[in-house]
Swiss-Prot record:
Annotated function: Involved in the biosynthesis of lipid A, a phosphorylated glycolipid that anchors the lipopolysaccharide to the outer membrane of the cell.
Pathway entry: Glycolipid biosynthesis; lipid IV(A) biosynthesis; lipid IV(A) from (3R)-3-hydroxytetradecanoyl-[acyl-carrier-protein] and UDP-N-acetyl-alpha-D-glucosamine: step 1/6
Catalytic function, reaction form: a (3R)-hydroxyacyl-[ACP] + UDP-N-acetyl-alpha-D-glucosamine = a UDP-3-O-[(3R)-3-hydroxyacyl]-N-acetyl-alpha-D-glucosamine + holo-[ACP]
TM stretches of this protein: none
Principal subcellular localization: cytoplasm
EC number: 2.3.1.129
Name by which UniProt lists this protein: Acyl-[acyl-carrier-protein]--UDP-N-acetylglucosamine O-acyltransferase
The protein's enzyme class: transferase
Length: 262
């Protein structure tokens, strides 16, 4: 049987697995679904069409599924979808999507999301990310797998941060951050590549060498973006062990909509 504190208000239409725990004074709306093993702390509000997966830990005072902070929103049935095994710390706010842009805000699996983080409408946070305290994502931001965002960082609408990239403390991010890169500051500057993070993920020496070379091509040799992209494409045959990493970078550069941080 679901463990619901007697002071919590759970709408009878909400769908909670029998193993879900709900803390004191939490409010859960009628269109909410919560999977097995998830624990919800005290004083949380979970509303809207919000789906939460298995084994998440949601700490006190979090607000999930509130209407988007977008003046165009007019009550349409948009969604928030959260995956499995996420840690969502105190005072986090995740908003529903808006129509015309997919209408769904998503958070994947195994993310570590610290206190006061804001995830706005239509953001897509993939898997294994770390978002430190007071991270603020504006609408339509995409964070790929294994991204790390330092505390007090703001990310502009429609920005993409590529896989394995790290953004340092108190940064202002207004352009796309390529995979593997290490950036920080306001204005934002590329400081190198995320060698410590990649080593922690067991990147081999050849893969690290390829990432280092991609960084050099983009940022250290005075090349235009087109010249750098040509050099990066050639690495797929020169460094076959890193072909997947090269392809990831090529795809990111080809699909960037805000221009890359340089």
């Amino acid at each position: 049987m679901t463990q619901v504190h007697p002071t919590a208000l759970v709408d009878p239409k909400a769908q909670l697995d029998a193993s879900v725990s709900v803390g004191p004074y939490t409010v859960i709306g009628p269109h909410v679904r919560v999977g097995a093993g998830t624990t919800i702390g005290a004083h949380c509000v979970i509303e809207g069409r919000t789906t939460i997966g298995r084994d998440n830990r949601i700490f006190q005072f979090s607000s999930l599924g509130a209407i988007p902070q977008d003046k165009k929103y007019a009550g349409e049935p948009t969604e928030l979808v959260i995956g499995d095994r996420n840690v969502i710390r105190e005072f986090c706010t995740f908003n529903l999507g808006v129509p015309g842009a997919g209408g769904v805000t998503t958070v994947g699996n195994d993310n570590w999301i610290m206190a006061y983080t804001h995830i706005a409408h239509d953001c897509h946070v993939d898997n294994h990310t770390t978002l430190a305290n007071n991270t603020t994502l504006a609408g339509h931001v995409h964070l790929a797998d294994w991204v790390t965002i330092g505390g007090l960082t703001g990310i502009h609408q429609f920005v993409s941060v590529g896989a394995h990239a790290m953004v340092g403390f108190a940064s202002a991010v207004s352009q796309d951050v390529p995979p593997f890169m290490l950036v920080d500051g306001n204005p934002l500057a590329v400081r190198g590549f995320n060698v410590v993070g990649l080593r922690r993920r067991d990147f081999s020496a050849p893969r690290l060498a390829a990432v280092k070379q991609m960084h050099r091509l983009l940022y250290r040799q005075g090349k235009t973006l087109e010249e750098a992209r040509a050099g990066i494409a050639a690495l797929a045959t020169e460094m076959p062990e890193a072909a997947a990493d090269v392809a990831l970078m090529e795809q990111f550069l080809a699909t960037s909509t805000r221009g890359i941080a340089r």
